[in-house]
């Protein structure tokens, strides 16, 4: 027996009703009777629809994967060799798969990675997969940028938040000029 909870009414239904599709028609379809659907009022005119079949659903989202193209994604084990021991400056971008602003600046970062070529190495570090680095460098907002030169953080190089490609270029050029790598 299922219930539909509205702002002031509870209805009990035990009769069979037409089925409801539980996924998009482009994928395999599992059909559930409408009687297995529970609607709960969350706020005025907003409803949360949940299936009470007891089965757990998982969904893979291709948009949640960070694709780096020319930018290498590194972890804690590669940080020392890639960033601290690098002969050239390294711009580290801390990102997360769930971070909207990180996804927003992705094309600009890719373009700048190609543009700077051998003057600058750009790497990404996943926030969720590398908690020790996040704590060590006190990363509180995403995306978060830190420039490293000769194994040390360049003073004043920290920046966080999404910015335009032009502003990113201005930021990087300013940093490279301050460490005499232009």
UniProtKB/Swiss-Prot annotation:
Q: Name one GO cellular component term.
A: chloroplast stroma
UniProt keyword terms in alphabetical order: Chloroplast, Disulfide bond, Electron transport, Plastid, Redox-active center, Transit peptide, Transport
Q: Which domain of life is it from?
A: Eukaryota
Which cysteines bridge via disulfide bonds?
Answer: 99-102
Keyword Kinase found: no
Q: Which GO terms describe its molecular function?
A: enzyme activator activity
Question: Where found?
Answer: Plastid, Chloroplast stroma
Q: Which organism is it from?
A: Arabidopsis thaliana (Mouse-ear cress)
What is the designated name of this protein? Thioredoxin X, chloroplastic
Annotated Gene3D superfamilies: Glutaredoxin
**Gene name of the encoded protein:** ATHX
- The UniProt site entry described as Contributes to redox potential value is assigned to 100-101
Q: Which GO biological process categories is it annotated with?
A: positive regulation of catalytic activity
- Keyword Phosphoprotein appears in the UniProt entry: no
* Tissues expressed in: Predominantly expressed in leaves.
Q: What is its main location?
A: plastid
In this protein, the active site sits at: 99, 102
Protein's job: Probable thiol-disulfide oxidoreductase that may participate in various redox reactions.
Pfam families xrefs:
Thioredoxin
Membrane-spanning segments: none
């Amino acid at each position: 027996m299922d219930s539909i909870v509205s702002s002031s009414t509870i209805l009990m239904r035990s009769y069979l009703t037409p089925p409801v599709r539980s996924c998009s028609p482009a994928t395999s379809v599992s059909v559930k009777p409408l009687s297995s659907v529970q609607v709960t009022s969350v706020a005025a005119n907003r409803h949360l629809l949940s299936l009470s079949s007891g089965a757990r659903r998982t969904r893979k989202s291709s948009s949640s994967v960070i694709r780096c193209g020319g930018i290498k994604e590194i972890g804690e084990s590669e940080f020392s060799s890639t960033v601290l021991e690098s002969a050239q400056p390294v711009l580290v971008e801390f990102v997360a798969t769930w971070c909207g602003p990180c996804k927003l600046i992705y094309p600009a970062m890719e373009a700048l990675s190609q543009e700077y070529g051998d003057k600058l190495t750009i790497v990404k570090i996943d926030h969720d997969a590398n908690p020790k680095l996040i704590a060590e460098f006190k990363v509180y907002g995403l995306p978060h940028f830190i420039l490293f030169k000769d194994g040390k953080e360049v003073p004043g190089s920290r920046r966080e938040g999404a910015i335009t490609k032009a502003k990113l270029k201005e930021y990087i050029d300013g940093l490279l000029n301050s460490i005499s790598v232009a």
